[in-house]
Amino acid sequence: MLDKYSPAEIESKHYQNWESQGYFRPDMDLTKPSFSIQLPPPNVTGTLHMGHAFNQTIMDGLTRYYRMKGCNTAWIPGTDHAGIATQIVVERQLAAQNVSRHDLGREKFLEKVWEWKEVSGGTITQQMRRVGCSADWTREYFTMDGVRAETVTEVFVRLYEQGLIYRGKRLVNWDPVLGTAVSDLEVESMEEQGSMWHMRYPLADNPTEAVIVATTRPETLLGDAAVAVNPEDERYTHLIGKELILPLTGRTIPVIADEYVEKDFGTGCVKITPAHDFNDYEVGKRHDTRLINVFDLEAKVLANAEVFNFKGEAQPGFSLPEKYAGLDRFAARKQMVADLQEQGFLVEIKPHTLMTPKGDRTGSVIEPMLTSQWFVAMSATPNGSEPDNEFKGLSLADKAKKAVDSGAVRFIPENWVNTYNQWMNNIQDWCISRQLWWGHQIPAWYDEAGNVYVARNQAEAEKQAGKTGLTREEDVLDTWFSSALVPFSTLGWPSETDELKAFLPSNVLVTGYEIIFFWVARMIMMTTHFTGKVPFKAVYIHGIVRDHEGKKMSKSEGNVIDPVDLIDGIGLDKLLMKRTTGLRKPETAPKVEEATKKLFPEGIPSMGADALRFTMASYASLGRSVNFDFKRAEGYRNFCNKIWNATNFVLMNTENQDCGYGATAAEPRGHSFPDMWIIGRLNQTIEQVTQAYETYRFDLAAETLYSFVWNDYCDWYLELAKVQLQTGCASRQRATRHTLLRVLEAALRLLHPIIPFITEELWQTVAPMCDAKTADSIMLARFPETDGGEIVQTAFGQMTVLQDLIGAVRNLRGETGIQPNVKAPLFVESADDLADYLKYLPMMTRLTEARQVAALPESGDAPVAVCNGARLMLKVEIDKAAETARLSKEAEKLQKALDKLNAKLSKPGYTEKAPAHLVEKDKADLAELEDKMAKVQNQLAKLKD
């Protein structure tokens, strides 16, 4: 007998053993097929969230599956140094002590960051172990460790030498609070209610005539370089080429024609501010306007405008109105609007809904800013030598496109290729510099004249310069730069290692769609460029995990679920404190508390890692989003318990018994048709689950396994086995015990990639009993294969007959309201001999007996059913009055529920305005109630006959 199922106990025991025994490490036998997979490195600052649990379940499932298939497997884990996120965490800790990074200086500050990383930076990798990730922790990397730092420097220098890295002045996303450029992924567009200001721009040669320009950002007016109109807009064609007076400045700017302007939107006149708007930058570039920067790096108005051409060359500047100098951009907006009003330039102000770009870390409004940055050229062809391969001579962007177009890298689902190509066809040069202290410092040095020397170290730079006293570039690299190198930086490049031969390209990358461009495309670029190989053969794109109503999980909504809380459980008080602490908007705390109490009135019970993993696997379809329902996790906790209890039953009936195993045992003979049926179903399940794993359809694998284990094995075969073990001859009992063990052991191996802990625990007991302990751990045992024998169709046909008979009897009981504790005799009238079937019916359907007769006995009240040509009668005395009263009460209860639901669905506007999933649930509930009502009415009608 097994003890009570306790996930926590078995999880800690087995994971420690797996890791200490080295089971996660590849054996580096290059004659074996390889399977490798890269972990998208989570931020070192991070903690496990549902998205991690989702994709790590898929990655670990694949790794365990291919390990069991005999592959040399490598799942390489690591963490990302997360430049901005990590620097903010440490700066906030210092701020609590009234210390800034500038007080410490760069060197001391970086020491503090490394100290923090060593103490707190491993949280997420420990949590990965809790989920059961069988990653090779001996190969764990950090994107700023010594090996990765050398690789980053080598790549940067080579790209620079090939003319693919340059420094230039371009428009970037600028976070004025952080004081650095940020990537598009670090910018959140927030819908806000703002204003649209309509302003008069008078003609220089006739100030009484003016064009009306509308803008949501009047503070950027100081940097206007032109006003654009559509070339086909007849209202303004006569003005193209004329000069306008720029309000508040006295400067004149030209009217230009550009198809970017939608003539039917607004007034049809658009102010062009190339230094402070990305779209305007492109318009200005087409017309070679000036780039006029009017803000400093803190987003305050400059005293003197900084002017450049599109080559980044400085042009003569000019003074800005003195009264605005030094004002924050929003204070300047307020003052300028007042001045526009006073001077007669403001026509009207209209309410306007707009999308405001904000930094995801600071919440500050992102400013498009003209700054000097380092860039990787996406479309330029490399200078100098390259490895001789199919990608040689192509630009980085073209290499990435060719890798996908040729099929060397495929997307799953395939429709993501369109998204990938859309991004690649509109690609811009990549801004790789950040104005931070934490990160890979750019390997470039400057002399006093501003000449730049890119080198692997300072000595090499000084050799290039022919002098000492150089100053190193202070900027660091974008975090995505080092992340883009992990397919080969983790395998020993630039050396030719066995790891590179065995594990590049990896088999699959499992990731979310939001980083297809930021990470996936850049890994393809860098890996093809430096190794001539693609980084991975397939990209499996999974959806985003949302809450049960389809809403994005966020702390402010109060709908975040911590995977570790699902594994361990958490009380309501602790859960409330966890969810309401550290909110970006503290005023949302009552709303968060209310939502939490509604969803988890008693907190979250412990589910265990296996239940969490099976839940995630069941959601791993090819959709764009995953609506996580806690009730499903509860259901799969019950599934794990079902497996545990089923194993207990098998052990109780096989321990110290002759099961047909052992060195001298002969193959059992005399299998019953249920034995043959479950073996056939096992073979079918092996084929289906293997296909599902091979095609990354973990949802289908989970569905198939659940159905086989719960329905076929537990609900049907175990119940039939009880009959066989009680009534069968010695040979039949031996064959049944043999089959019980054989099928259970194989099922545990089938389940192992998804639920590794419980399967390891049970397999260690079950496998030795059926000569299947071929390895020290189930994770090293072979994945089940079909036995090669044909499915016995006769057994399948016999099982169908039996299931139909049992179903018919159960329906008879249900339709006539026979209570579960009431036993009755069954009479069967059939031309066929049903003896092989009838022996199973009493135990399966709570009968006193099941007897085949030549003709059914006379009984006007006894219910009769027809099944496969046989007539079935339950001989039972029914108290018609009592049963009629019971059914009438049930009908009344159902009618009230139907009336309530019909009223809800017929309420005006409900089906149009309510969330679609709620409407569908209500309709499904209505159909179920109607079905129940029909059955009750049918029973009442029979009682009246």
For every predicted segment, state its role:
Residues 64-72, 93-106, 126, 130-135, ...:
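Secondary-structure transition/capping motifs at alpha-helix termini
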Residues 24, 165, 346, 409, ...:
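Conserved hydrophobic residue
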